[in-house]
Amino acid sequence: MFNFANFYQLIAQDTRLQPWLNVLPQQLTDWQNAEHGDFGRWLKALNKIPQGAPNQVDIKNSVTISNDTPFHEGELKKLESLLRTFHPWRKGPYTVHGIHIDTEWRSDWKWDRVLPHISPLKNRSVLDVGCGNGYHMWRMLGEGARLTVGIDPSHLFLIQFEAIRKLMGDDQRAHLLPLGIEQLPKLEAFDTVFSMGVLYHRRSPLDHLVQLKDQLVSGGELVLETLVIEGDENAVLVPTSRYAQMRNVYFFPSAKALKVWLELVGFKDVRIVDENVTTVGEQRTTDWMTHNSLPDYLDPNDPSKTVEGYPAPRRAVLVATKP
């Protein structure tokens, strides 16, 4: 069983987040009562991971954990075996006491594209929607955020996050909750909200943008990253079935169309700050994620297209302000 008591205590002392306590404990109790086939096995492995007290942690330039006194070889082998229990590792990379977790995604590349364009995170409370295993949450703390809260309904992502947090020495500035954005009340409590790699999974993208806006304080900043297509403000791709072998994908606007959508739901100062074609260097199969990945999803005869014939993945970052 997971104990979220530390987070409850934390938000009880935050006047902006206090109202969340009206619904959150019951939501997480319901989640605890819903079974997941592998969760018990993952939890046993998590409990065997040693509680860290590392004296060298770098979350500014990477996510790296180490000690002046290195682990013995046997301890390292045991730790690596436990971490591999949580396969597949999709978001990262992490370096833990010399163990390099080479994840499917180079999430650090995305962070490097996003960071120059956003307001400084120092002393901000941050919400990361669809946070995966929390890689970017650690990088947000590295930029001085006061608190990072991530939401993602995946059981495995929560386990991976808690494993890294345990090795970090139980850092209580970051918390991952196994929830979807639709389960959050209108909090209007966060200084910055990130939604990266989520919008195209939403059946109603405008509703998603409103949900994000509802979590921001007045004057707060939205950082939105999603798959887009080339085109003008009227261009939108709606795949008929899969896109790059992904199910549950719905709307791929152009960056210009997405800017219009953000303005339509009430954001101001909307900026397109980055547009980038995803390469097979950024998303690929690794020793820590051995399933198919981007190279398998592109047309082998024309890598500018997916196997379904759609334009290959292109991602845009937009930044906007809530009035």
Curated annotation (Swiss-Prot):
Q: What is its EC number?
A: 2.5.1.-
Task: Name any one GO molecular function.
Answer: transferase activity, transferring alkyl or aryl (other than methyl) groups
Q: Which CDD domains match?
A: AdoMet_MTases
Q: Which domain of life is it from?
A: Bacteria
User: Which Pfam families does the record cross-reference, listed alphabetically?
Assistant: Methyltransf_9
Summarize where carboxy-S-adenosyl-L-methionine binds, as residue positions.
K91, W105, K110, G130, D152, P153, S154, I181, E182, M196, Y200, R315
- Top EC group: transferase
Q: Name one GO biological process term.
A: tRNA wobble uridine modification
Q: Which InterPro entries match?
A: CmoB, Mo5U34_MeTrfas-like, SAM-dependent_MTases_sf
- Keywords from the UniProt entry: Transferase, tRNA processing
Q: Which reaction does it catalyse?
A: carboxy-S-adenosyl-L-methionine + 5-hydroxyuridine(34) in tRNA = 5-carboxymethoxyuridine(34) in tRNA + S-adenosyl-L-homocysteine + H(+)
What is annotated about its quaternary structure and interactions?
A: Homotetramer.
Record function comment: Catalyzes carboxymethyl transfer from carboxy-S-adenosyl-L-methionine (Cx-SAM) to 5-hydroxyuridine (ho5U) to form 5-carboxymethoxyuridine (cmo5U) at position 34 in tRNAs.
Please give the family membership noted in the entry. Belongs to the class I-like SAM-binding methyltransferase superfamily. CmoB family.
Q: What is this protein called?
A: tRNA U34 carboxymethyltransferase
Q: Which organism is it from?
A: Vibrio campbellii (strain ATCC BAA-1116)
